[in-house]
C-alpha cells in the first residue's frame, strides 16, 4: 500500500516564492519564531507549606547570626581559634552542621572512596644519626651490641590516647599542673565545646564505613596543636575505613616531620595489631599504607624503620614488602633506605626489604653498594643457619650489581658463600660473581666480522 502523501508543506512552493519576490523584491521571508509556552497564571502565586517553612527557617537563622554579630558575642570555638589554634576560620554552626551532614551520608556506597588516586609527589630523604631517637618517646628502643636487645617499657596507643584526653579535660577544669618544659611551650587550654565536638567526631569515626568526613576532622592538620585534638577522636577506636581517610588527609596536609610522627604513633601500632589478630592486613589499612608512600621520606622514617627495629616478623615483612614492591619509590629515597637498613641487626625481615629495594634495579651509589657488601660479610659471625630469604637477597644483589663491586669485595662475598652458602642458591651466587667483570674493569666485547 503506498504511503499517504503529506498534506502540510514545510514551505511554500517555488512558483509562489518567485511570484511574491517579483512583487516585494525579496525571494523568501524569514519565518517568525513563535515560542510555545504553557499557560501561566496571571494572578498571585501561592507557596506550599514545605517551601514556606524552609524560607522562615532560613530567615530565622540569618536573624540570629545578625543578632550575634551586633551583640559582639563570638562562640567558644571562634575565640579558641583567635588565640592561634587555627589558621582558617571555624565556627560552631559549621562543625555541628558538618557532623549532622556526615551522619546522613554514612550509608553512601564506599566504592568511590578508595578509587581516587592523587598525583604522586616525593620529597627528599635525609638520613642522620638522630633517626633512632625518633621513636624513643612512645616505642621501645634497641641498644647494646649485636644480639643484646634491651627493651624499655612501651606505651600502647590506647594508653597514650587516654593520657592525652585526661590532660585535656584537666586543663579545661584548671586542675592540670604542667611541667617546666610544658610551661614554656604552653598553649591555651582547649574549650569544653571543642572537647565535646571532637569527642562526637571520634564516635562517628568509630562507626564510619563510607560517606563524607566531618569538616571539623579535615581541619585538624591546619591546627597548631593538631596532635592533642587528634587524640580526642580516639584513633584506637577508628574503623579501618576511617584510618584510610585519615591517612589520606594527614599525609597530604602535614609537614614531613609531622606526617612521620603520625605514621609512627597512629598507623604503625594499628597495622601491627591487625596483622597479629587476623593473620593478614585489612584492605583499607593496606590502601592507607600505599597512600602514605605519597611522602616516602616520612614513610621510611615513620613506619618502615620503626617496624624493623621492633622485631618485625616475616609475615609483617611479606605484607609491607608487597606494598613497597607495587609503588614506585624515587632513587634517592631507595638508596638512603638501603643504607639505613644495612645498619640494623641481621634478620630475615631486613633481608626481605633489602631484596625488594634491590629488585627495583636502580643505579645505586658506590657508598650504598659498599655498605651492602659489609652487611653480607656480617653473616660469617652468625651462629644460626641463614634463612632462604637471606640467601635470596644476596643472590639478587649479585645478579643486579655484580659489575659495580671490586674484586676484593667479590672475594669476600665468595668466602661468605663458602661458609654460609645454601646448597642450591650458593652455586648461583658463585656463578654470578665469577663470570662477570668488576668495578673499573673493561667489559670485553666480541667483534663479529
From Swiss-Prot:
GO CC terms: cytoplasm; nucleolus; nucleus; preribosome, small subunit precursor
GO molecular function (one): snoRNA binding
Record bears the keyword Lyase: no
Ranges of compositional bias, category Basic residues: 1-13
BP terms from Gene Ontology: endonucleolytic cleavage in ITS1 to separate SSU-rRNA from 5.8S rRNA and LSU-rRNA from tricistronic rRNA transcript (SSU-rRNA, 5.8S rRNA, LSU-rRNA); rRNA processing
This protein's UniProt keywords: Phosphoprotein
Region (Disordered): 1-125
Record has Ligase as a keyword: no
PTM-bearing positions, type Phosphoserine: 22, 156
Family annotation (InterPro entries): Bystin
Compositionally biased spans, kind Polar residues: 73-84
Organism superkingdom: Eukaryota
Family in the record: Belongs to the bystin family.
Protein's recorded name: Uncharacterized protein C13G1.09
Lineage of producing organism: Eukaryota, Fungi, Dikarya, Ascomycota, Taphrinomycotina
